[in-house]
Structures are given as C-alpha cells and as structure tokens.
C-alpha cells in the first residue's frame, strides 16, 4: 500500500521525505525514526544508506516551496534506471488514483514521455526543498517481483504499445536473436565485446544499443525476440515483454549481481534462462569458449 503523508518535506534532489521525526528514502524502502534510534536497524544496507544520506543534512522547512494538492512521489536516487521505473514506480501509478507525479530533473526524457503517453501528469521538480500538502509514496516489495506485478506491467504495456503499433514493427511470430550491448553504459560493459561479436554474428545475433530506442521500441523488440544475450543491466527488464520460450543468457560480473533480481523475475514465466559469471575476478570479460558452449547447445536444442 502507498504511504500517504500530509505536509511532507521533500528533497527533490534525491527523494528524501520527512514528516515529523520520521524520514523515508528510496520511496518506502528505507524508513527511519530520528526520535527513536533504538527502533532503527542496527547494521546492514538499510542503516548504511540512511547514515550516508544524513551526512548531507535534512530538508530545511525555511527553504521549502509549497506544493498544494495531492501528488505521487516519483523521485528516488535510482529512478534514472529503466529497471526501477518498471519495478518501483509504474506498478504504484497503475494501481493508484491519478494525481500528478513529481519527478526529478535527472529522470530521462523518454521516461517522462512514457508517463505522459500513458496519461500520467508528470511534474518535473528542480533539486530544491518542497512542502507537499499530500504525498503518496510508493510501496517497495521484497523481492522486487511477483506474479501480480508482472501481469500488471504486461497489461499496461499491451494498452499503450499494442502489437504492430509502431512503423516497421515485426509480427509476434518473427524471431530475433539479440545481443544487448552495454558499450555506451558507464558501468558493467564487457571489456572484450569486440572479440566475441564475430561468434555472435555467426549464430545470427544482432547487436542492439537500447539507448538508441524509445521505450515502445524496446517493448516491440523484445516481443519479437527468440534469443537474448545481455550483461546484467536494466535492459533485461524488457524480458517482461518476451515470449515464455525465449532463451536468455544473463552475464553477471559476480554471482549475486543485483541480489538475483533478474533470476527472480525470470522465474515468474521465463524458464529457459541461464547465467554466466566470468571466471576472472576484477575483469568483466566473457571467455569465448564459455559463450560458444552456450550457443552450440542452443543451436542443438529443438524449437518449441
């Protein structure tokens, strides 16, 4: 359930919310009571995130701009990520009564365009302090995914991105083998991509930069995918739109990348998924022999 606060102080730079002696960070993921420290987690990720954030200070009510009315909170430190847009914010907006959504300046324009296309009113806030008359904060589930959330997202995109709705879109029966490159990403890009691309080309894979595609274009691409190979990253969230028999290879820097977030997602409807962890620590490179083994095995498997 969303948390509903009245006269809440909001730091629009990162989404920290304060009401009285209580604060919330990363939507409802990290609550904290300033007046009762004994009730807060003593150790762990929760405490670390809050203590780090508190070094920056709390919102100053003297600097607050007043926002009258009711709003959804759409600001969190990771809301620039496609994964967190779909896992954290969209399910809340879909299931809630429509009010304007407060989003940060750092939210990508294509995310804002998606919200507007879905008839959500997005209000972009500068990184200042605001006093919000009534604020709805999204709930954070553990784990991130469940069957209900998956169906909610899929149904939502079926309405706003119908099949064959885009120019030159492929039919649902077409089969595309795609490799999602993270070469344009700041982190988690495979250092030896140029070495294994010929092997992928041999097996009829196409290299895709999701940064060059709109959200609807990404949805359509994955609807037509028969095989997906990608390093651990937000683009794999698009498996939500792939068929149940798609073959997936997730390449992780370490076994526990993202606290198994995609493994959890794939377990809800995509049984033909697997992962590889490069054997050399400190280097995110994919050995050709490991990739070749997977590709040859896939090649020999009968079509379903």
PLM region descriptions:
Residues 1-304:
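The feature primarily captures lumenal catalytic ectodomains
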